[in-house]
Amino acid sequence: MIKSTNIQVIGSGIMHQINNIHSLTLFSLPVSLSPSCNEYYLKVWSEWERNGTPGEQRNIAFNRLKICLQNQEAELNLSELDLKTLPDLPPQITTLEIRKNLLTHLPDLPPMLKVIHAQFNQLESLPALPETLEELNAGDNKIKELPFLPENLTHLRVHNNRLHILPLLPPELKLLVVSGNRLDSIPPFPDKLEGLALANNFIEQLPELPFSMNRAVLMNNNLTTLPESVLRLAQNAFVNVAGNPLSGHTMRTLQQITTGPDYSGPQIFFSMGNSATISAPEHSLADAVTAWFPENKQSDVSQIWHAFEHEEHANTFSAFLDRLSDTVSARNTSGFREQVAAWLEKLSASAELRQQSFAVAADATESCEDRVALTWNNLRKTLLVHQASEGLFDNDTGALLSLGREMFRLEILEDIARDKVRTLHFVDEIEVYLAFQTMLAEKLQLSTAVKEMRFYGVSGVTANDLRTAEAMVRSREENEFTDWFSLWGPWHAVLKRTEADRWAQAEEQKYEMLENEYSQRVADRLKASGLSGDADAEREAGAQVMRETEQQIYRQLTDEVLA
């Protein structure tokens, strides 16, 4: 029984003083508040709204606060309102959504709170967390230190902050996401932990991994060894240690154990070579480019490329060129430098091609030599597809067909490599993808593929794999290529320019089908599968009908033009 209630404002928060309470604590207060409490909150919130700064949407926040209090709602959503501060929060809420604001600190948190989503703010610290808290997401902030973590916490996401150390992890924790911080050590993992994201830190040593863990993302740390418990994880578990300087002994041991006939542990992804990133180039963009040209051209080339130094991904492209010069192909392949120089000249003449190529090169952020080589393959593909789309092959259908066949073969090889990766327990997927392209470059006439790679020996790709892959590519090419080519974007671009009337007729035929047949064909397909009224099934059926229609129309057009 509560005989009297006094409310005092202390600092920026509210403290309820309950007098003469018989066997009642603050955490067992009834959900509904007295009118005087409501009046207090409304007064505080009104004043907070009036004192807002330009850009803050405090009027919207005030309305949501008021409705939340009046209706005793459990969830309060103040996300994406450009708020710089928060007032006292309704005491009954269990979920607080404050994502994507400009908050640097938080007020005292309600005592029954279970879920906080506070990512994408500017928080430098967190207040004391209530004992009831089960889920905390404060990623993408500026937090340097975490408070004590409640025992009931099961999900903790504090990635992309400024943490140097973590507190003791609670026993119920199932998910820990702390990637992108400044951690050099980690406390013991709780026995119930299932998911771990620890990438992009400075961790030198891991504690033992609990058997419950099914996913551990540990990329780009300073790990030279792994705990033995990693090999005792379940067979369906996934561990990624790419970008760590694992010792030669560790690599050999892992490879020996994971390739054994009795191995039943997790799949482990690693990377060969120096794991340092190449985001900081050794040279400016202009200098990195001119290094590929003969001395008598360097001055003119430098002047041209200076104009591109502020384009998106220019720095990573410069770093990529630095690393490309140190690959096996650059050192051993005759004419490689001239090939790169000719490619760079084409980039300087086309803003669209340059933008595409800079974006492709941005993905090669690791300095592993074979990753750079695979990126060079992709850049060659980008160039040829761009040239085809721009009209280089408008008068040479044979050359366009040859290019299409190469792109088709590469696509099939990627499918084969993807399937191969799934079968390996200790794998660098870059080496697998590159191995199929490099080792079959001559037999499949892959002009875009480098002819040498450094780490084929660790790819896990066998001679039998290569024979099987070649046979599969040739079989699928014989049965599927013409259908694939009829849907290929560069071929459509050529048809629009060289067969404008036929293209227009094909498009008209497609639109007539959409108007007259599409809905009925989708409905028939859903009825046949017993999925009428299922929105997801309807979208999938619609995509299938559209693809079948385009396949039929564009295949007929392709056959007519190529006849």
UniProtKB/Swiss-Prot annotation:
Class of enzymatic activity (EC top level): transferase
NEL domain boundaries: 284-563
Record Gene3D superfamilies: 1.20.58.90, Ribonuclease Inhibitor, Shigella T3SS effector IpaH defines, Shigella T3SS effector IpaH domain
LRR repeats: 69-90, 91-115, 117-130, 131-150, 151-170, 171-195, 197-209, 210-233
SUPFAM superfamilies xrefs: L domain-like (SSF52058)
Region (E3 ubiquitin-protein ligase catalytic domain): 282-563
Subcellular location field: Secreted; Host cytoplasm
Region described as Interaction with target proteins: spans on this chain: 1-270
Assembly description: Interacts with human RBCK1/HOIL-1 and RNF31/HOIP components of the LUBAC complex.
Family recorded in the similarity comment: Belongs to the LRR-containing bacterial E3 ligase family.
Record-given protein name: E3 ubiquitin-protein ligase IpaH2.5
Organism annotation: Shigella flexneri
Underlying gene: ipaH2.5
